[in-house]
Amino acid sequence: MDRETFHSCSSLVKLPRQIHQQHCSSHFIEYIEREIPYSKFFKNYLIPNQPCMFSKKFTEEWNCRKKWVTAEGKPNLQRLLHEFDETPVPVANCSVKEYNANPKQIMPFKEFIQYWRESIQNGHSSPKGCLYLKDWHMQRNFPEHNIYKTPIYFSSDWLNEYWDTIEVDDYRFVYMGPKGSWTPFHADVFRSYSWSANICGRKKWLLYPPGQEDFLRDCHGNLAYDVTAPILQDKGLYAQFEEACQPLEIIQEAGEIIFVPSGWHHQVYNLEDTISINHNWLNGCNLDIMWQFLQDELSSVQREIEEWRDTMDTWHQHCQVIMKSCTGIDYAEFASFLKTIANNRISFLNSSPRNADSCQDLLAESLCALGPHHAAFDLQRVLHIFEIMLNNEDFKRLDPATLSFKPEDLLQEIREAIRTIV
């Protein structure tokens, strides 16, 4: 990031978010044919939270596009079987609806490949239903395979940076599914960004801008499972359905990468036998969206157990526990998340020299590539959200023992680090 982008975007991110009305009448997204400056992607897509598609040129050198795909452009099932054989993988049944999602099971990879082959031979039909290998942490389990490289546009990835640091989880996934497999209507974890690269095959995406999902809830407040289902025409169940805009309908070809912005709900179909790589990620540009999501989730929990507020001394702590069980994070861990991100950037800005030759690991390499102004931007965003959090009544109620640091001390360190750049 250059100095000009830093100064222009530092003011933009503090403005109220705009409603995405322009996409309610549009049926296309911008297509990026060849490399553009990172600052252009940052200003045109990350900050305004707008979708786009990258051409297959951005993935043509990936090992997975060479090794996992046949000369005919189909999944190389034999090669995949050789590489992963008995590996346990998560597989969803797209033919079954369970709690507004598809039930999953763990099965050996070779069993899924056997199913896939039989499905293809039977015209993409199987008595087992439509099975879809999804949310597989392949990169975490097989880092030595080196099958792809994250494009620089998606490299400011706080989500995976934090979870890699604590060595608990990650949000990098491989999906493999036959023609006809699909993912029901949803928004991504923590309302994060996502990027999805088709290694082979074709997908159809139905994208709705933030806010449109409110028109796609039933009379009980439940989000639609399938936005194309005839039941949505029932005004008794979906009273506001007709107020929703038409979705952006996007066809993604082999090799292309789609950028799905924060909070955009979507439904996805595999039009052919398809393999894709997907990351959920967030950074300073959509940190405010994650924080708002966490507040909304906590409010929802509080409403559910409101009747016990006056009779339970630890009611607020219980709300945090329930929230974490539902969403995967609570306010204390969110604060720890921000601290980790801040500390990494403070260390980077305090290091000398700050160049690619001195970078010893992937995180340092990423910070070097993005530059000191990006690190300063990140720190400004952490500072801004932390200042808001310190005035939040629910955050104030946290037991100090749940935090391993004093937020006020961290904020002072952040201010001092920013001054070295600004």
From Swiss-Prot:
Matches recorded under Gene3D superfamilies: Cupin (2.60.120.650)
Xref: SUPFAM superfamilies: Clavaminate synthase-like
Reactions catalysed according to its record: L-lysyl-[protein] + 2-oxoglutarate + O2 = 4-hydroxy-L-lysyl-[protein] + succinate + CO2
EC top class named in words: oxidoreductase
GO CC annotations on file: cytoplasm; nucleus
Highest rank taxon of the organism: Eukaryota
Family annotation (InterPro entries): Cupin_8, JmjC_dom, JMJD6_ArgDemeth/LysHydrox
GO biological process: positive regulation of translational termination; protein hydroxylation
SMART domains reported for this sequence: JmjC (SM00558)
EC number: 1.14.11.-
PROSITE patterns: JMJC
Listed transmembrane segments: none
Pfam families per record: Cupin_8
One MF annotation (Gene Ontology) recorded for this entry: metal ion binding
Keywords for this protein: Cytoplasm, Dioxygenase, Iron, Metal-binding, Oxidoreductase
Protein residues bound to Fe cation: H186, D188, H266
Subcellular compartments: Cytoplasm
Cited function: Catalyzes the 2-oxoglutarate and iron-dependent C4-lysyl hydroxylation of ETF1 at 'Lys-63' thereby promoting the translational termination efficiency of ETF1.
Family: Belongs to the JMJD6 family.
Protein name: 2-oxoglutarate and iron-dependent oxygenase JMJD4
Organism: Danio rerio
Lineage: Eukaryota, Metazoa, Chordata, Craniata, Vertebrata
Gene that this polypeptide is encoded by: jmjd4
